[in-house]
């Protein structure tokens, strides 16, 4: 009997929708990253993008514990001298709540071309509505 190895042409992709309301940020991000990688499937193959598409709604209602709202800082750089910008989690949740979940999930995916390809299957929306209704996504519970 031979060991089964999935190929890019045999992978079936599903669409899932996750309601981020009442979930903790890190716990939600780790579960979403596992689905994006395909680790929830028996046909998981480390060197292939065998994950599913995930839609996250209500990103503005995600919870964080402790004093992270005031103490967690996101850094970005403009590539100019003195161009380091700092943004707290509280400011980010007010301006771009989608970016908070995207950054958390992106940090849990592999670094490199395969991780970037997996990240393209993540769709995050601040409110309860999304644009992927035509794909008929299934509700994903953790």
UniProtKB/Swiss-Prot annotation:
Ranges annotated as spanning the membrane: none
Similarity remark: Belongs to the universal ribosomal protein uL13 family.
UniProt entry tagged with the keyword Lipoprotein: no
PANTHER family, per database record: LARGE RIBOSOMAL SUBUNIT PROTEIN UL13M, RIBOSOMAL PROTEIN L13
A cellular component term, taken from the record's GO annotations: cytosolic large ribosomal subunit
Complex and partners: Part of the 50S ribosomal subunit.
Coiled-coil ranges per UniProt: none
Gene coding for it: rplM
Function field: This protein is one of the early assembly proteins of the 50S ribosomal subunit, although it is not seen to bind rRNA by itself. It is important during the early stages of 50S assembly.
Protein name (record): Large ribosomal subunit protein uL13
InterPro entries according to UniProt: Ribosomal_uL13, Ribosomal_uL13_bac-type, Ribosomal_uL13_CS, Ribosomal_uL13_sf
């Amino acid at each position: 009997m031979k060991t089964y190895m999935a190929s890019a042409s045999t992978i079936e992709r599903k669409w899932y929708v996750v309601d981020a309301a009442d979930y903790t940020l890190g716990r939600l991000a780790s579960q979403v990253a596992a689905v994006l990688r395909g680790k929830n499937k028996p046909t998981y193959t480390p060197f292939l993008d065998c994950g599913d598409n995930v839609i996250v709604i209500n990103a503005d209602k995600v919870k964080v514990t402790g004093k992270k709202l005031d103490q967690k800082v996101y850094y970005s750089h403009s590539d100019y001298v003195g161009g380091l910008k700092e943004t707290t989690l509280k400011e980010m949740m007010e301006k771009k709540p989608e970016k908070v979940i995207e950054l958390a999930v992106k940090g849990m995916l592999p670094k490199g071309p395969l991780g970037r390809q997996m990240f393209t299957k993540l769709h995050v929306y601040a409110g309860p509505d999304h644009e992927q209704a035509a794909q008929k996504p299934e509700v994903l519970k953790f």
